[in-house]
C-alpha cells in the first residue's frame, strides 16, 4: 500500500479510482486486486480509522465491546492499493477526473463511487448541541453507542423515546433494534413496567418487508411499546428534555407535538454526500444512478457504484455490500475487456433484527421484498443461531472475509449467455 497526500499540478492516472474507504470501497478493491493483482487502483479516503458499524447496535445493548468495532485504516487498506488521504470534492465523468479537496485531480479509466451516505444531524434543530448528554443518544455514532448503554443501565423509570426518520437510511432495522435490546434489559431488571416506551416512525409501517412484521409485533407487544406512525423528530431541547415531532393528523395535515423524555435514542435523517448529489452522476434524489442489476451507471459506462450512495433500491447494509462487491468486480473487469457484463445483483440485503439478547430475526430479502434466506429455516422465527451469527461470525467475516476480497457465500446471479 502506498499513500499520497501532496498536491500536484497534473492529474495522476489510475486504472481505477475508488471514492470511499468504507466496507464497499475496501472490499471491492480487495476483490479486484485478487482477480488482477497488476491493476493500479487508488482509494480516496481521508479517514484514519475504519469502523465495523453493524455492531454499534450491540454496543448500545451491552452485548459488544466498542473497541472491537474500530481498526486503523492502514490495517485494512489492501496492500497493492494506493491510498489517497484526501476527500473527493467533485467528479467530472466527461474528462474522467476526480477532483480532491487538496487541489489535486486523479484521472481514471474506471470509477467506482462508494462514499457512503451523510448523517444529517443538523436537520433536527437543537440535536447536535445535546447529543451525548441530557439523555440524548444514538447508536449511529461510534462515540455515542456506549452512552446508549449507559442510559439504558441507569434508567429505572420514566419515558424512553426511540425515533426513525424517513427512508432511505442505513440498516432500516437499526432504530427498532435499539428499542428491543433496551426493553429486553429493562424487562430482565424488572423495571420495564415503570418505563413508558414509544417508537416514533416517520413512515407508516414497522418494517418494509411485510413477512417479518408479525414476528416483530409480538416483541413490540411483549415490551408494551407504543408505535407512533407518521411522527418525525424535528427538534430537541436537551435542557428541558422535550422532543418535538411533526405528526401527520387524520386530515392529512401536519401538527407539532412536544413529548417529554428521560431517554431519547435518535436516528438522524440520511442524505447522499455532496460529491455525488452535486454531480451529473446523481439521480433526482441525489444518489449515484446505476442500473439496478449491473450496478453500472446508465449514462457513463466507465462508472460503477455500490454501497449506501448508489441508487439501487436495496437495503443499505453491509450484507448488501458483500453481494454488490462481486457484481461490480466482475462487471467492471468485463467492461475493461469489452465483454458483456456477466453478473446481476438481485437486491440482496440482510437485517439481523436483535429482538432480544440471545435471539435474532434474520431478515434476508431482495428487490420487491422477495425473501432470500441463506438457511432452509423459516426466516421470520427468532433464533439463537442468528444471534451467534450477528454477534460472533459476521464481525469475523467482515474483517477477515469482506475486507480481504474473500467472497464466501457471495456468488451473484449470472446474465443469460
PLM feature segments, named:
Residues 12, 362-417:
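C-terminal auxiliary extensions adjacent to catalytic cores
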Residues 128-156, 260-323, 333:
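FAD-site-proximal beta/loop scaffold in flavoenzymes
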Residues 205, 344-361:
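Flavin (FAD/FMN) cofactor-binding core of flavoprotein oxidoreductases
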Residues 2-82, 166-210, 416-417:
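Beta1-alpha1 glycine-rich phosphate/pyrophosphate-binding loop at the start
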Residues 184, 321-347, 353:
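Internal hydrophobic alpha-helix adjacent to the cofactor/substrate pocket in enzyme cavities
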Residues 2-14, 82-190, 254, 265:
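FAD-binding core/adjacent interface of flavoenzyme oxidoreductases
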Residues 38, 81-91, 95-98, 106, ...:
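A Rossmann-like FAD-binding core segment of flavoenzymes
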Residues 21, 102, 115-116, 164, ...:
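Glycine-rich, N-terminal phosphate-binding loop of Rossmann-like dinucleotide-binding domains
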Amino acid at each position: 500500500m502506498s499513500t499520497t497526500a501532496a498536491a500536484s499540478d497534473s492529474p495522476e492516472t489510475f486504472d481505477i479510482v475508488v471514492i470511499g474507504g468504507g466496507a464497499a470501497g475496501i472490499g471491492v478493491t480487495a476483490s479486484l486486486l485478487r482477480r488482477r493483482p497488476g491493476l493500479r487502483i487508488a482509494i480516496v479516503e481521508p479517514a484514519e480509522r475504519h469502523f465495523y458499524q453493524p455492531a454499534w447496535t450491540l454496543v448500545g445493548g451491552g452485548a459488544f465491546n466498542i473497541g472491537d468495532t474500530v481498526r486503523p485504516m492502514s490495517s485494512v487498506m489492501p496492500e497493492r492499493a494506493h491510498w489517497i488521504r484526501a476527500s473527493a470534492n467533485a467528479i467530472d465523468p466527461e474528462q474522467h477526473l476526480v477532483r480532491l479537496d487538496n487541489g489535486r485531480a486523479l484521472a481514471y479509466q474506471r470509477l467506482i463511487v462508494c462514499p457512503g451516505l451523510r448523517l444529517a444531524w443538523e436537520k433536527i434543530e437543537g440535536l447536535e448541541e445535546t447529543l451525548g448528554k441530557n439523555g440524548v443518544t444514538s447508536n449511529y455514532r461510534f462515540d455515542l453507542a456506549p452512552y446508549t448503554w449507559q442510559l439504558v443501565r441507569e434508567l429505572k423509570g420514566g419515558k424512553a423515546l426511540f425515533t426513525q426518520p424517513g427512508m432511505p437510511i442505513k440498516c432500516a432495522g437499526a432504530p427498532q433494534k435499539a428499542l428491543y435490546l433496551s426493553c429486553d434489559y429493562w424487562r430482565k431488571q424488572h423495571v420495564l413496567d415503570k418505563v413508558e416506551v414509544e417508537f416514533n416512525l416517520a413512515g407508516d409501517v414497522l418494517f418494509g418487508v411485510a413477512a417479518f412484521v408479525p414476528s416483530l409485533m409480538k416483541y413490540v407487544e411483549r415490551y408494551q411499546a407504543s408505535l407512533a406512525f407518521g411522527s418525525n423528530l424535528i427538534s430537541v431541547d436537551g435542557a428541558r428534555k422535550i422532543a418535538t415531532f411533526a405528526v401527520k393528523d387524520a386530515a392529512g395535515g401536519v401538527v407539532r407535538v412536544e413529548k417529554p423524555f428521560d431517554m431519547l435514542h435518535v436516528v438522524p435523517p440520511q442524505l447522499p454526500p455532496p460529491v455525488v448529489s452535486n454531480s451529473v452522476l446523481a439521480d433526482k434524489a441525489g444518489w449515484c444512478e446505476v442500473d439496478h442489476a449491473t450496478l453500472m451507471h446508465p449514462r457513463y459506462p466507465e462508472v460503477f457504484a455500490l454501497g449506501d450512495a448508489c441508487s439501487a433500491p436495496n437495503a443499505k447494509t453491509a450484507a448488501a455490500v458483500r453481494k454488490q462487491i462481486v457484481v461490480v468486480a466482475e462487471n467492471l473487469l468485463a467492461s475493461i475487456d469489452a465483454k458483456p457484463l456477466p453478473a446481476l445483483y438481485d437486491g440482496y440485503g440482510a437485517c439481523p433484527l436483535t429482538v432480544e439478547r440471545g435471539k435474532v430475526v434474520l431478515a434476508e430479502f431482495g428487490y420487491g421484498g422477495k425473501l432470500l434466506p441463506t438457511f432452509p429455516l423459516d426466516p421470520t422465527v427468532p433464533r439463537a443461531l442468528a444471534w451467534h451469527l450477528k454477534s460472533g461470525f459476521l464481525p469475523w467475516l467482515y474483517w477477515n472475509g469482506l475486507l480481504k476480497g474473500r467472497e464466501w457465500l457471495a456468488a451473484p446471479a449470472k446474465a443469460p449467455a
